[in-house]
Amino acid sequence: MRVLVSNDDGVDAPGIQILAEALRHGGHEVMVVAPDRDRSGASNSLTLDVPIRTRRIDAQTCAVAGTPTDCVHLALTGMLDCDPDIVVSGINNSANLGDDVIYSGTVSAAMEGRFLGLPAVAVSLVTHNHQAHHYDTAARAAVEIVARLKADPLPADTILNVNVPDLAWSDVLGFEVTRLGNRHRSEPCVPQRDPRGRTVYWIGPAGPEQDAGAGTDFHAVRTGHISITPIHVDLTRYQALETVAGWVGGLTAALDGPA
């Protein structure tokens, strides 16, 4: 298969290099199109107000001065000579569990591939303080999952969000299909003073686990399993439709009232 590989940690990150090599070793034709620097937390942002510069590093690698979504969008809308068959994003050097997927550039790169018609997988290594030890485990998991997708494709609107514990392959207890858990609200922002005495802010840490019981991605990874969560992009809150429908009469009546 022709595999487009991207990430949000940047084209020089070890995770993407190990992933690309593992996929090549697995017999796939791999093209890497990734940000020229760390763009973690970029979510689904596209660059629309300035042109995007690219730089060929070698015949199979291109660095992009843009977001992860930019990278995949460009690659799938004319930048590459040959169309890929699948998008694999990662290996991210930290978890993308629960609510993390909303902010994750890793997941968003996969999501853009899915928007543009390709199967897509996001792969993250659940590290402690970003100290990764077993990218090879996550890469091997990715190769296995790509093979399964080729043999048994999923519905066209499905993205696989994969989180891998930072363990040796022989220590992983298995794969689990999971749902997204969620976290408590984020920790407070962190104010500091710059050298001129002005206040600046750092975004605070993600909140601790909240919904993290059996069946969630949090629980699977915590118990030594590789979590596979099928996700899609329909954000409709179906349980609220009836309540909001009850508002419609009053809202419509307000249109006839005074301006």
Curated annotation (Swiss-Prot):
Gene3D superfamilies recorded: Survival protein SurE-like phosphatase/nucleotidase
Binding site residues for a divalent metal cation: D8, D9, S40, N92
Cofactor note: Binds 1 divalent metal cation per subunit.
GO molecular function list: 3'-nucleotidase activity; 5'-nucleotidase activity; exopolyphosphatase activity; metal ion binding; nucleotide binding
UniProt keywords, alphabetically: Cytoplasm, Hydrolase, Metal-binding, Nucleotide-binding
Catalytic activity: a ribonucleoside 5'-phosphate + H2O = a ribonucleoside + phosphate
Cofactor(s) this protein cannot do without: a divalent metal cation
Record-linked Pfam families: SurE
One GO cellular component term noted in the UniProt record for this chain: cytoplasm
Domain of life: Bacteria
Localization annotation: Cytoplasm
EC number: 3.1.3.5
Enzyme class of the recorded protein, top EC level: hydrolase
NCBIfam families: PRK00346.1-3 (NF001489), PRK00346.1-4 (NF001490), surE (TIGR00087)
Family: Belongs to the SurE nucleotidase family.
Primary role: Nucleotidase that shows phosphatase activity on nucleoside 5'-monophosphates.
Protein name: 5'-nucleotidase SurE
